[in-house]
Amino acid sequence: MAALWLLFCLSSSVLTTTTATPQPVSASVISRHDLFVQIDPERHALLAADRLTIEAIPGRPLRLSLAGTLHLDRLALSQSPTDDIGRDLPFQIEREATAPFGQYITVPAALVTAGAMTLTAHYHGVIDDPPKEPRHLRFVTPSETAGHIGAEGVYLSSETQWYLDLPESLSRYRLRVALPSGWTAVTQGQRRSSAPCPAELCREAGLTLAEWETAEVSEALTLVANRFVETSREWASSGGQSVRLATYLFPEDAGLADEYLDATARYLDAYISLLGPYPFESFAVVENFFASGLGMPSFTLLGSGVIKRHYVQPYALGHEIVHSWIGNSVFNRVDRGNWVEGLTTYLANYYWHEWSGDHAQARDQRHLMLRGYNLHVPPERDYPLGQFTRKQDERDNAIGYQKAAMVFHVLRQEVGEESFWRSLKTLVAQYRGRHADWHDVERIFAETAAKDLRWFFAQWIEGTGAPALTLKNVTAHPLPRDADGRFSLSGSIAQTGPVFRSPLPILVRMSNSRQHLVSTQLSGADTLFKSDLPFKPLTIELDPEAMVLRRLARGDIPPVLNHYVTDTKRSVILAFGGSDTDSHPFQDVVKRIRSQDAQKAPGQRTAITTLAENALLPGEGSVL
């Protein structure tokens, strides 16, 4: 094997260049990978062979990406499906100046033939990018790594570029992975076998060879490995679909397996009824050696810290399971925005509570999403939902997840219950194994509901913001000559910013502890409403159940620390007098605030006073 590998290394024709801004030139795609990888965790090393089936466009070069730390030893063109040796292909290596860790392997256009081409690539190298703490808040992003092979674990994803790839490829995969004894590999699809690696295939003795294969196409293949304890069960949904459920946990957490398997079964059963058949043969919960919460086709990769904290809530495990349909079966066309995270948040973080009958928690979740958008996205920092691609900070999270989820809630009210859920099943069925964007979502909902929804998507997806509302000219008086003592209520709702179309429920609290709901439809700068009431009205409130997306007045948001953090005007009032050098419980906090403010303009700094200096609270801004 070693001699044969040396022959591969010596037989290829290679030219290396550097390009400043290489442009994609190939419309060819890879339809299948047949991969063998041998992994040495102690040396961070990978040895690989990949047999690629390419649907090629003749006359155009193939430009395949590969990690810059991997060395391509040989590239060969197979003359037939049974040709395992093939004819050597010359190739050019381009290293991108703006991404020094990446490289492109280019096959000249003259060698690219029409139809299916089979290439075999042999390569080796090191993948060693240890996970680092995120640059942003932990709840927004996981630990950062492009990929890592080490004694603590293996993580190889699309960002690792651990196999040759072409843009826009949706591929099927067969993967054989050899690892030291005691290690278990997990990837997408089904594991077909696991046995000692034969000597003719593996360079070292004592390795275990596992074979995995995907039935569905995927945008990328993620491979993880560690010293797992595997627990599995066969499960059938209430509709009869069979799915293999599994956990791959570290030995100290193996006792949590049944809790995760039970929760997985509950979520799958619910979402199969809502979205249609589960698109894969199995689902696994896999423990990771660094902080993560990632959903891949047929498994989720959760950091050890959250595994230990029983991460089975709807916003946690439920969210990753919904991604099985939304994002991992129907793919997002990221260059045209990201609808996947908002819909997944709506179905998992919110709708699970409504579906299970916990209406109080559902209401709280709507308020949470609405307040999150208002807290983290002031009007001057807003941007259209259609421009969201991924979250990097709280603002992105509030727009791409929370606002988007509320938009789907408003869409559900616009098209009605039956059309909304039928649209989702249609979307999942029609775009299984395909990319979809916001325009595809619009088309599906419009056709299913038989409604023109162009205005809706132009307003909520392509536009910015949400309606800012004010009650005006509200009056109530007894109805004349009414023996039942009824009252007439009227008024108007002014939109103080851009004009939106939106439903708006108004709650009227009356005498005798009665309530009355007035349904209105915002359609202009001022919307009139009128209603006859059976009792005297006492108070009136706009949308107390948070059913629609809107800008909230400051008084409508309960005091929370996030409001202070995101406010542009901040004050700190100390209950203890004296200077920073005096001893008081918040001395270190005050010093840190002053230190952070030192780099800001005077008008942007936090005002710090004591109760003795200022007996009145500031008239504006947040107070701590």
State where each predicted segment sits:
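N-terminal, polar/Ser/Thr-rich
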Residues: 5-47, 73, 146, 167, ...
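Surface-exposed beta-strand/loop patches in extracellular or lumenal glycoproteins
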Residues: 51-69, 161-180, 439, 487-507, ...
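Hydrophobic alpha-helical and helix-loop surface patches within well-folded domains
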Residues: 212, 244-492
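Long, folded non-catalytic interaction modules
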Residues: 560-624
